[in-house]
Amino acid sequence: MKKFWTIVICMMLLGAVAFAAVGCNKGAGDTINVFSREDGSGTRSAFTELTGVLVEGEDGTEKDMTFSGASIQNSTNAIMTAVAQDKNAIGYVSFGSLNETVKAVAVNGIVPSVDTIKDKSYELQRPFNIAYKQSNIDNNPLAADFLGFLGSRQAQEVIAAEKYIATDDNAPAYVKGSDLTGSITIGGSSSVSPLMEKLIEKYCALSGVAKSSIELQTIDSTAGMNNAINGTFDIGMASRDVKDSELAQGITAEVLAYDGIAVIIHNDNAVEDLSMEQIRQIFTGEVREWSALA
């Protein structure tokens, strides 16, 4: 009989330990793990401005209030991979890069889609810009021809097929230039890069230009603009508005396409919709637990 009660007591103690462990795991699992892009990212610049994470101080200077404990990732793919592997994660990426490995939440009740971005009912959206020094284009017939292609009907079709918003529904057909010698260096935003890669493929197929003649470097928007300014890149890419200070240094900017910014979470996360204010609070660190959003 004594042995029986000893076994019962041991089982009760084990149960209490297990219950306590479950309780601890539940509490830890409720913490929101914030993932953000690096400084210089056009996606971060647009996201922080649109959500109010970027604030203006009393002296008129802007300050990015992104949560100091956020895990910083240096590309679109890095953000998606990190969020896909963490059930408590939240991040943001280009809508055009979105895939089934993560879940995009509605913002203020509006689900991101081509239609809601196009009609502007989905608020988190921004332009994809290209920029260049006109003198560089004038001295590079291949770059000039490629720019002409980017404004063509065929380019607009590629943009739409890749889930971005085209800028001209009545664009003219591409007409191949006569002098397609030389090379082009294009670089900048990791959000624009996947679309640019598709556009380069289409251009090479239409023009007969070897793909090796066009170098595509994936960095970030700020580097893209700076390298367009100093002439390292024939064409720079930015997933944000081109700044007045950048334009003042002699570059010409054109909108390539429009894109949404998707707020993403793990596929197993039950959250479906967040308000813009909730997003701001999460990414500034004011709200640290998923349960606080209920």
Region spans (language model):
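Sec-dependent N-terminal signal peptides of Gram-positive bacterial secreted proteins and lipoproteins
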Residues: 2-26
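Exported/periplasmic ABC-transporter solute-binding proteins
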Residues: 24-294
